[in-house]
A protein has these predicted regions:
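N-terminal membrane topogenesis motif
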Residues: 1-23, 218-241, 498-507
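Helix-terminus/linker motif at the lipid-water interface of multi-pass membrane proteins
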Residues: 22-39, 106-107, 170, 239-284, ...
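Helix-loop junctions and terminal segments of transmembrane helices
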Residues: 58-73, 278-309, 315
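Alpha-helical transmembrane segments of multi-pass membrane transport and lipid-handling proteins
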Residues: 84-108, 312-363
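Alpha-helical transmembrane segments of multi-pass membrane proteins
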Residues: 112-134, 346-370
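Membrane-interface junctions at transmembrane-helix termini in multi-pass inner-membrane proteins
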Residues: 128-151, 359-389
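Membrane-interface helix-loop junctions in multi-pass transport and translocation proteins
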Residues: 146, 157-195, 200, 381, ...
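Membrane-proximal transmembrane or re-entrant/amphipathic helices at the cytosolic face
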Residues: 460-507
Length: 507
């Protein structure tokens, strides 16, 4: 099985991330155009619960398996067998709990009985996601990113196609059944992914002589302990974010219920933020994710050798590279919120939240890089503590603001932005304290200058120039023009020197 280098792996992740983001957005467009605002709101109410249950079912195996597989060729079969048993036990227990708790969650927490059937339908999906994560973890441990990228691509295609089929088939029976259909589509998408991974896995066995096999093997207690020793702490870290996300719609609907909003209106308001604005705002993160994954081994090695200047150089370049997509995306979100919403989702719901959130959300595009640096310098526990504290404060602030009639759903928006500022700022302060890295004030000023000039140019252009084309062509023309202006400004201000970029790529 062919391995990839770190740079090759990062490139594969970047390409796969881009394709998955595009397909994910296509899936979101399909959901919106077929389900409408009400359907998206209903789906977004159960989505955090679904993500929490998936986190619990996978129990940190996506992190534990690559780590253990990369360390040993002899025990790979035992690692896979033990992981499969752990995943199936967890998925079974969680599904049983879900069967008995779905009704109370729907009625008392989400305050919307329509969520009961969609919640129940999550059960089978947990088994598929767990098995898929095990197989993907195996290939990542073998440093082969192709199966993961291909299987994820196939999963997205199957999910989108079946979403359309199931929604068209079930929508006449009611909106609830159509939402259930989207979860069925996710399940069959995961099944398709598993089939691709299994075929690749079985093919790889033919080329191995001493590693993994399909023969039954005896397992001992230490095999499970080795896996759980890594997976449980990893689960704890992910649970913080998942549980915070799980509580989010519960707090929103309950606080708005106090103000007199019906469950349907609350779901629609929450869906506008979480189902329309946030997916668009998160689109550029696939680029920053690939960059953050690429710098981890380099910074980790530099930290072990005490080469702090090397860390500063790599971190500075990563932040500068992330500034390119982050900046132009922010400007476009601020200038064309209604056009983007109408073009993609055929609605203006969420456009005002997109425009308000974009300037502060800009910081999130650097948050992943800072978190990766903390992991590389063995300070992941501090990053987890930051996430925990900021999540708690976000929930407290959200609960307080949502109950103010004049603020209502904007309390969620303010709390999300507060969380981004606090987490990003805190992580930067930790890095500054640990390795002495400081962002140059001159670079910050030049960055804001580039953003400001691009935004003002776009605003003036919109006021004085009307293009005689379709909405799509107009948006593309404005975006290309502003993008070129932005890149020119970045080049003139030397925020991203070409010489340093070429040196970085050669390494």
């Amino acid at each position: 099985m062919k391995k990839q280098t770190v740079a090759q792996g990062a490139l594969i992740l970047l390409i796969a991330g881009f394709m998955n983001r595009v397909l994910g957005m296509v899936g979101r467009i399909v959901l919106t155009r077929y389900l409408g605002d009400d359907g998206v709101g209903l789906y977004m109410l159960i989505a955090p619960t679904m993500m929490l249950l998936m986190t619990l079912a996978s129990i940190g195996l996506p992190i534990a398996i690559p780590t253990l597989i990369s360390r040993s060729n002899v025990r790979q079969n035992r690692i896979l067998s033990a992981s499969f048993i752990i995943a199936m036990i967890c998925s079974t227990l969680i599904t049983i709990v879900l069967i008995f708790t779905a009704k109370p969650i729907a009625i008392y927490l989400l305050k919307d009985e329509r969520t009961y059937l969609p919640l129940l339908s999550i059960g089978p999906l947990l088994f598929a996601v767990s098995l898929s994560s095990i197989l993907k973890g195996y290939f990542q441990g073998k440093q082969n990113m192709y199966p993961t990228a291909i299987s994820t691509f196939v999963e997205q295609l199957v999910r989108i196609a079946l979403s359309v089929i199931f929604i068209v088939w079930l929508l006449p029976y009611g909106l609830v059944y159509a939402v259930v259909g989207t979860i069925w589509a996710s399940f069959f998408g995961e099944v398709a992914s598993i089939i691709i991974l299994l075929i690749t896995f079985l093919t790889s066995l033919r080329h191995q002589h001493t590693a993994t096999s399909l023969k039954p093997i005896p397992l001992e207690r230490h095999h499970f302990k080795d896996i759980l020793a890594i997976s449980l702490p990893a689960t704890g870290s992910r649970l913080i974010g998942s549980f915070s996300h799980f509580l989010e719609p519960i707090l929103v609907v309950n606080c708005l219920f106090v103000l007199g909003y019906s469950s349907e209106v609350s779901a629609k308001l929450y869906g506008a933020v979480a189902g329309f604005a946030l997916p668009l705002l998160l689109m550029p993160t696939f680029i920053t994710f690939a960059i953050s994954q690429a710098i981890i081994p380099v910074i980790s090695k530099a930290y072990a050798r005490g080469h702090y200047e090397r860390i500063h150089e790599q971190l500075s370049m990563a932040l500068r590279l992330s500034f390119i997509p982050a900046g132009i995306a922010t400007v476009l979100f601020m200038l064309f919120p209604y056009e983007l919403m109408d073009l993609l989702f055929d609605t203006d719901s969420g456009a005002q939240y997109l425009q308000i959130m974009a300037p502060i959300f800009f910081l999130l595009y650097f948050q992943g890089i800072l978190t990766s640096v903390l992991q590389a310098i063995n300070k992941a526990n501090k990053a987890m503590l930051t996430t925990l504290i900021s999540s708690i404060l976000k929930l407290i602030l959200m609960t307080f603001l949502l109950q103010i009639p004049e603020i209502n759903i904007y309390g969620l928006v303010i709390a999300i932005l507060f969380n981004i500022v606090l987490t990003t700022g805190w992580n930067y302060w930790i890095i500054r304290h640990e390795v002495g890295y400081r962002v140059k004030v001159s670079s910050v000023i030049l960055a804001f200058l580039c953003l400001g000039i691009t935004y003002l140019s776009g605003a003036i252009l919109l006021q004085n120039v009307t293009l005689p084309y379709s909405q799509l062509l107009n948006l593309l023309a404005y975006s290309c023009g502003l993008g070129l202006l932005y890149l020119l400004l970045v080049k003139l201000t030397r925020l991203l020197p070409a010489k340093q970029v070429s040196q970085l790529l050669k390494r």
